[in-house]
A protein has these predicted regions:
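Class II aminoacyl-tRNA synthetase catalytic cores and aaRS-like
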Residues: 9-570
Length: 570
């Protein structure tokens, strides 16, 4: 029942807006503060309202070239909608009513009546529904409107002169725009073409949209999607699905943790010492205490304090902040899950992470085998591969790389590792050691090539200051990283709980920091004191929620974050 002319109309509307914006950009734009511009827009709104109040028509209330208020004022399309809002207020109609008699969702009406009515069938069932107007068609004494619910479910509304009267129909045609939230109440019927519809006996604007929607039949550009995510949610089902799938994924993680008797806690975002991961922190200042603080890079040290306090299984899902680069798998603000299990180790926590990922795939997509955005399938089921960092690097280089086991067993020298890195063109750090070079060399050969789920085990001690030393391998710690589709998804440890060794590790990190390593962590004396009280042996894990969604869907990190951070245009 929908005519193709609506798509054309939406496209023309979008082009008009773009044209207006281009004209504004090309014109000489006066310097104006944010407050000044906001006040100017309010003055323009008031001027439009005054014209309407004095009896002007909608067209007469609009200033197409913005001659009065200049290029930074409302474009013509917005002015027209502001004028309609003014006309509603003049007529005593609330453009943003507090409540409406909504008796059913669009999805509920669809579920109850889809396939039950033949073309032309009418029921006496009256429903009150509301949704966003995506299409409008004027057929004289009958108007058709398509309403969309937040989940994308759509239904047709029919507004008839015979049912609501000539004045109400005229008002409908005059006031309702694409993008408005509209309430209609009436009987459920099937149109002559068989379209499930609500035949309106009454209607009301639930929220007047002053900003026009873009052309919904066109793909959104990346700039609009990231700068105006709310537009993306309206226009693109994939974006709405990502929001829902993310919520389902977090709910699944919480359920699996609950099944294993883990307790969820919240730890500080503002910290006096940055630690828990090797990363550059964001800094801030607390005026009340005249105290410099860090936005946390990880909750690890506080969660371990919970183990000291007797909470043997603990997890947190929350935000972390790292003042580093941005790419397809990294964002400065992201969501992490970290968990710690007393009397566990990196083997038991690895088994838990595997279950967490597999349960999430099952709960979100109904299978361990998921379909990515590019149409390919990825299987999280079955057994997962395990490799050793040192063994796999030795194999790739064709020579044995030996861990740094201390003064009596120094292993492969930093100088030799540096020569290999230079020969291969591997990027080197300003402050480097055996462990950093080993990891950089390993990443050169393997990082983006581990497609199937793979645990990479047994890391250099220098790069893992919070991890317990390996039970049988000097210079190595009991740590794994989980790689999926060529990127790191999660990490897990046998947690270091010896306060003397932990102090030694902190001192080594602090020396690196003094030498210029911005990712090295500080010495946290309060944490060392807590370890001195006694922390049981434990396994710990960390996994990015954003990265989990990347793994499950094939999206970029920006596509998994509902409101990603973007650099302002001005």
């Amino acid at each position: 029942m929908w005519c193709s002319g609506f798509s054309v109309h939406c496209g023309l509307m979008s082009e008009t807006i773009e044209s207006q914006e281009n004209q504004n950009e090309e014109a000489a734009v006066p310097a104006m503060t944010t407050v000044e511009r906001a006040e100017m827009l309010l003055q323009q709104d008031a001027a439009i309202y005054a014209k309407i109040n004095d009896g002007a028509t909608l067209d007469e209330a609009v200033d197409p070239g913005n001659k009065e208020f200049g290029p930074l004022a409302h474009p013509e399309q917005v002015q027209m909608r502001v004028a309609k809002r003014a006309m509603m207020l003049k007529d005593g109609i609330q453009p943003y009513p507090v409540t409406l008699d909504v008796t059913a969702t669009i999805e509920e009406v669809r579920a109850k009546y889809d396939g039950k009515l033949e073309a032309g069938d009418e029921t006496e069932d009256v429903v009150g529904i509301a949704g966003r107007v995506l299409f409008l068609r004027n057929a004289g004494g009958l108007c058709f409107v398509q309403l969309s619910a937040g989940d994308g479910t759509k239904i047709q509304g029919m507004i008839s002169k015979k049912e609501i009267g000539a004045d109400s129909l005229k008002q409908f045609k005059q006031l309702v725009d694409l993008g408005d939230h509209l309430f209609i109440k009436g009987r459920v019927i099937a149109s002559k073409t068989g379209e499930l519809s609500v035949f309106a006996a009454e209607w009301a604007i639930a929220a007047k949209a002053l900003q026009p929607l873009p052309a919904l039949h066109k793909d959104l550009n990346e700039d609009t999607r990231t700068r105006k995510p709310y537009i993306g949610m309206i226009a693109d089902e994939k974006i709405r699905n990502m929001v829902r799938n993310r919520s389902k994924a977090v709910a699944s993680l919480r359920k699996t943790f609950a099944d294993h008797d883990f307790l969820e806690v919240e730890t500080p975002m503002l910290q006096t010492v940055h630690g828990g991961a090797a990363a550059r922190p964001f800094t801030t200042h607390m005026n009340a205490f005249d105290l410099d603080l860090y936005l946390r890079i990880a909750p690890e040290l506080f969660l371990k304090r919970c183990l000291v306090g007797g909470i043997d299984r603990v997890f947190e899902i929350n935000r972390d902040f790292r003042n580093e680069g941005v790419d397809a798998t990294h964002a400065p603000e992201f969501t992490m899950v970290e968990a710690y299990q007393a009397y566990g180790n990196y083997d038991t926590i690895g088994a838990l992470v595997k279950q967490l990922v597999q349960d999430t795939a099952m709960d979100v997509f109904g299978s361990h085998k998921v379909t990515l955005l590019d149409g390919t399938e990825y299987d999280f089921g079955g057994e997962w591969k395990t490799i050793s960092m040192y063994d796999s690097l030795s194999e790739a280089l064709g020579e044995e790389i030996v861990p740094n086991g201390g003064p009596d067993n120094p292993g492969t020298s930093v100088g030799h590792l540096g020569e290999i890195a230079d020969k291969l063109g591997v990027e080197r750090d300003d402050v480097e050691n055996h462990g950093k070079l080993v990891e950089h060399l390993w990443e050169h050969f393997y990082e983006d090539k581990l497609y199937e789920p793979t645990f990479v085990r047994d890391f250099p001690v220098e790069t893992s200051p919070l991890v317990k030393g390996h039970r049988s391998k000097a210079g190595v710690v009991e740590k794994w990283d989980l790689y999926v589709r060529g990127f790191e998804l999660a990490t897990g440890y046998s947690e270091l709980n010896d306060p003397v060794v932990q102090r030694e590790r902190f001192v080594a990190q602090a020396k690196d920091a003094l030498a210029g390593d911005e990712e090295a962590c500080d010495i946290d004396e309060d944490f060392l004191e807590a370890l001195g009280v006694g922390m049981p042996p434990a396994g710990g894990m960390g996994m990015g929620i954003d990265r989990l969604l990347i793994a499950l869907t094939g999206a970029t990190i920006r596509e998994t974050i509902t409101f990603p951070l973007v650099k302002p245009l001005n």
